[in-house]
């Protein structure tokens, strides 16, 4: 049976403590599909912002230069609005997608806005991103691993497919979010088990196993809920067959630099 299935999933992080304030925005995101299919749709989130977000234009293409790009709409409107505290699905577009297909999403906004739903990677072979503070600009992607490659709002890409994949979750702290560990595994699964597995990345840099983020510094607040809390809440709604976790260093280190974390440990 043909159905919508997640072909790419990177769970957005709450950056409301350190929002990105932009007069204008353009961002280019490279994703790699775990599944083959004939149609595509995007999930865009604004869970953590204080106001609605407006994107004037969103496009999808198979090349980074965005030649032969297709316009993405939501409710058949070119201007896409993401209500505060919500997520939306775009309308589907026809696109012939193969396993391992590289897809580029180009999003533009001329509105002065704060972006709080954020995700990033350092390893760029399968997922990459770049953004600029101008609406009329196509950002260039960099392949260097020394700097963070971040993007806003895009959390999931689904394809209309006959495949019925199992889900593998990778989660924990920065080691899992950065992609150095997960990218080889993802590439292996695409090659050896095409159309059978989709990897879900729900890691958060700075995350701890037991305690939620301390609040004595804005950067600490971005570390989010404890992994135990997040796994119970399961915001993604997926039921992974297997979850791979790498976490623990921040449980040891944060109490050394944060008074709030030190009190949490003592309690």
Enumerate the language-model features and the residues they cover:
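Conserved SGNH/GDSL esterase-like catalytic core that processes O-acyl groups on lipids
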Residues: 61, 164-266
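N-terminal secretory targeting modules
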Residues: 1-171, 176-178, 183, 191-194
């Amino acid at each position: 049976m043909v159905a919508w299935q997640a072909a790419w999933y990177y769970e957005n992080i709450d950056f409301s403590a350190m929002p990105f304030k932009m007069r204008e925005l353009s961002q280019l995101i490279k994703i790699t599909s775990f599944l083959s299919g004939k149609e595509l749709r995007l999930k865009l989130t604004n869970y953590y912002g204080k106001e609605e977000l407006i994107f004037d234009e969103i496009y999808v293409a198979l090349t980074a230069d965005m030649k032969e790009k297709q316009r993405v709409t939501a409710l058949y409107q070119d201007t896409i609005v993401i209500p505060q505290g919500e997520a939306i699905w775009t309308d589907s577009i026809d696109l012939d997608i193969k396993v391992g297909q590289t897809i580029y999403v180009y999003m533009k906004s001329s509105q002065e806005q704060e972006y709080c739903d954020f995700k990033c990677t350092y390893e760029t072979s399968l997922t990459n991103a770049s953004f600029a503070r101008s609406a009329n600009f196509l950002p260039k992607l960099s392949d260097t691993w020394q700097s963070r490659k971040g993007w806003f709002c895009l959390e999931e890409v689904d394809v209309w497919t006959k495949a019925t994949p199992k889900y593998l979750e990778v989660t924990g702290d920065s080691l899992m979010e950065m992609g150095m560990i997960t990218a080889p595994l993802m590439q292996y699964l695409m090659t050896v088990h095409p159309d059978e597995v989709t990897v879900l990345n729900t890691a958060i840099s700075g995350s701890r196993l037991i305690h939620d983020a301390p609040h004595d510094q804005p950067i600490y607040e971005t570390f989010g809920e404890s992994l135990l809390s997040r796994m119970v809440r399961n915001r993604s709604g997926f039921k992974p067959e297997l979850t791979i976790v790498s976490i623990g260093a921040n449980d040891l280190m944060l109490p050394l630099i944060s008074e709030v974390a030190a009190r949490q440990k003592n309690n």
